[in-house]
């Protein structure tokens, strides 16, 4: 592989210095920007970072052998990281959009057989090949929007056979697509129709059958639960998360999205890597998360699409908890792949600064999927995952919403998007 020399960026936003822990409080505003910055890449890794003058001198005898990427007038950031998605699914749910506009709530639609249950039916019925192709198209769109690593949850199978099918497709995508796919088992996404009269029985199936099988096959790193009234209680969620820990699956939790339900407190209790949503989390729950180092993954696109009040990122940041942002890409409550849009919503709806929003989709998002040591910032030794945005500064990326500013994407030192087009 030829060396890659990315030269003369208007802004090189490195976010250097937080590979061992996420950024918190005022540190989220410290982006460590290099004007007229350049990056030298060797064998898929970042080998040097500095001004163009510094690197041109350092590598003057090797520039002729390198592939040159001219970043003049552009902003270079770490590859974006999406730490919470449900992008491996079949079907679509645009009919529910009209239902919600007529006044139906998320839980009303779900209890009527729509929502997660509708996507479960479509995903169960889809062949593995169909599921792969539909999901690959979404993954291509993530890449075109600057995402180089994405978390993918199961949870639209809700049986051993179909959960394994979803996770197998996610693994195949990780192996065949430039974007790294980090898998989360979420058999506890909903209680399927066949278990609606015996939810505790379904919990036993998750604990005694699904988790052991997923662990045996090596299909996931994390274990997630939708802890909400009418879905899984805190007691049921605790059982599922502790069972996952026993099999080496790190806990995550969908917490306090619809009402304060003790999800944030439970996340702190079980040592979750992250607690996600948190629209209605209690102050005490947030305090405990901050104390235990649980990352708050906030999903403003979901609140926007469901027309509800978003989580209070300002309060969570000021409380000392690390904050990441994510699309929550899914067919029912956030059908988007655009992290730049999510950054804009994080500022407008959640009280974040633009710098905090960018940190939340790079280094903090990387820590939310246990990858902060290898991605999320532009530092020597890390993966050469980089994005060139066709804007002169990072503020424009967030301010000028509604269009895709991605020009070039580098994944593991290889150009995979050029002039806004896939080239892998």
Swiss-Prot record:
GO molecular function terms noted in the UniProt entry: imidazolonepropionase activity; iron ion binding; zinc ion binding
Q: Does the keyword Ion transport apply?
A: no
The entry's free-text remark on the cofactor is: Binds 1 zinc or iron ion per subunit.
Q: Mind telling me which InterPro entries this protein's record contains?
A: Amidohydro-rel (IPR006680), HutI (IPR005920), Metal-dep_hydrolase_composite (IPR011059), Metal_Hydrolase (IPR032466)
Q: Which residues bind N-formimidoyl-L-glutamate?
A: 156, 330, 332
Where can this protein be found?
A: Cytoplasm
List of residues binding Fe(3+): 84, 86, 254, 328
Sites where the protein binds 4-imidazolone-5-propanoate: 93, 156, 189, 257, 333
Task: Write the Enzyme Commission number(s) for this entry.
Answer: 3.5.2.7
Q: Where does Zn(2+) bind?
A: 84, 86, 254, 328
Q: By its UniProt entry, which SUPFAM superfamilies does this protein fall under? A: Composite domain of metallo-dependent hydrolases, Metallo-dependent hydrolases
GO BP term, pick one: L-histidine catabolic process to glutamate and formamide
| Matching NCBIfam families | hutI
Protein name (database record): Imidazolonepropionase
Q: Give the originating organism.
A: Geobacillus sp. (strain WCH70)
